Amino acid sequence: LRAMTFPERGLMLKALALHLTSLKATYYPVSAQSGATKVDSWIDIDGGIGNLFAYATLRREFQDLPYYVEGQPARLSREGSFIGHHIMLPKRGVAVHINAFNFPIWGMLEKIAVNLLAGVPAVVKPSEYTSYVTEAMVRDIIASGILPEGALQLVSGKGRGILDHVQRGDVVSFTGSKATGYALKQQPLFMDRGVPFNLEADSLNAIVLGPDAHPESVEFGLFVKEVVREMTVKTGQKCTAVRRAMVPEDLLDAAQAAIAGRLSKTTHGDPSVEGTRMGSLASFEQIQRVQDAVQILSSNQTLVHGNLDGSGNPTGNHADGAFFAPVLFRCDDPYGKTKAHDVEAFGPVCTLMPYKSLSDAANLVAKGKGSLVTSIVTADKDVAKTFTLEAAYSNGRIHILDASCAKESTGHGSPMPLLAHGGPGRAGDGEEMGGMRGVMHYLQRTAVQGHPNMLSHIAGQHLPGADRPEASPHLFRQHFEEVKIGSTVTTESHLVTLKDIDEFAELSGDKFYAHMDENALDGTIFTGRVAHGYFILSRAAGLFVDPAKGPVLLNYGIDSCRFTKPVYPGTSVHVKLTVQEKINQEKRSEDDIAKGIVKYYVEVIDDENESVAVATILTMVRKLDQS
């Protein structure tokens, strides 16, 4: 796994995602045994597979190497013969994932997608309550042979002793309750052995209705719908579920009536029964845990919907499932009566409370001591900005919802693979996913120093100061396999004239005064009419391109471009075209042309031997081997 390049690992994830997609229908009946509705299972199964696809796509953000070359080199000497750079290599241990019961598939796939792309194998310990769902998929993953042998291992059951064997180079991540997570995090072995411990704990997440809303506004309806959805999807068993709903104090009664009214129409019970919108808790043990938390919450706030024991009228046979009907509390004094800020009932339970101002709302959110996510529902951009900047410090994510994005919004409770998932304080102070950010948790950053030739060889890309041997034949006559990093074409010179400037202005329509009006240059940096930067770049292409048909298929684009010095009529310019980096591309079909991307560093140099323009261009180049 470590020897594979990032693109190869990404293609491995893509193949795995496609394979699991072909089998996903077989996981739904298994998921239903956990009390999940079809929607709940879709979030878990399809959402989890979606994470694999997302991280497979990220392969394009990394170099075609088994390790990552980070950022830009640092010049450490006057003449440039000694430089520094950073490389990030896969850690030599394993990723140990201790997962929660609520999302037995998504919880596994959202983590292993990251460590597998990084080149680190995983040991997964699912919750014993729903491990049978995880096991069904892991069995298929192992049987597929898509992953290298041993890259994924499953440990079911209590998992006692699993942490006794972790060593330097391993990474441990935990998702679950605050109490269990804190107990694990405090074990001295993590400090003694230098093992990172990433904690993502359940938190008292909030949703805030903006002061611009009123009962007839679209945003009021969105708020009510979001609260009810977060209470009932997965029966409220989500680490991101809304536990505290905050509204302007003059809207408290209206919000209570609307939320309770919508909850009363929510059918709960056996997910196999047609029309059931909310399933059961994951186990009978969870009923007691939720009931205990509800009893504590009821000690200083008012029950306005449901029953304290979670009783209701579930569909199906009541004895067959861990059914718990939605419970809504109201707390009129959220500063004096604080149980809602301290106690989480991990089920379909939420507390409604008032606020007086936006800063007051942000303060109430922060009383949860750190949350994974808070939503603000508002149509006012100033409200959204003010609240976000005030509340962000106590949250891992701020979800802004209004009518303009509601149709496509992924919702309050859905962490996205390319965004960081985690939160401060009670939420664990950890971070998962986040696109490339997540991959970095499984890589060791190392600074390397030396001559640019040495570091260029390590980095797999040409670095400033490294040798640039003249290419023979011309680079455009070489196939992808033949092109060498650092090979350079030095062109003939071109004398820039006023005629060039006039003709380019006429052709392009760019008649900016600095190019055309020598009487308008007072107070500028220019001493005369200056050539267009894009003319210099275009003329550079005319100098370095070998126009005859050959291995180069097309110009793929420009990554960066800078015009570093004015070019005046009478200046001669030439180009150095240097191979900066090579990126292999996979064939999309049997008929596809085998090819790769070659990044060229283009340096335009004047007759004083100074750079006037630099750019990185990309070309698509045919391979010799078309198999």
Model features per residue range: what roles?
Residues L475-T488, F563, V567-S627:
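HotDog/MaoC-like acyl-thioester-processing domains
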Residues T524-E581:
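Hydrophobic beta-strand-centered segment that forms part of the acyl-chain substrate-binding groove
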Residues T5-L11, P126, I146-E149, R168-G169, ...:
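Conserved C-terminal structural/oligomerization subdomain of aldehyde/semialdehyde dehydrogenase
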Residues L1-G80, K265, A282:
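N-terminal Rossmann-like NAD(P)+-binding subdomain of aldehyde/semialdehyde dehydrogenases
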Residues D140-G145, G169-V171, T180-Y335, L358-S359, ...:
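ALDH superfamily catalytic-core signature
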Residues L1-R2, L76, V96-H97, I207-P211, ...:
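Short, well-ordered beta-strand elements within core beta-sheets of diverse protein domains
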Residues S472-A531, K623:
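Catalytic strand-loop segment that frames the active site of acyl-thioester-processing enzymes
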Residues Q63-L222, Y355, E408:
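Rossmann-like NAD(P) dinucleotide-binding subdomain of oxidoreductase/dehydrogenase enzymes
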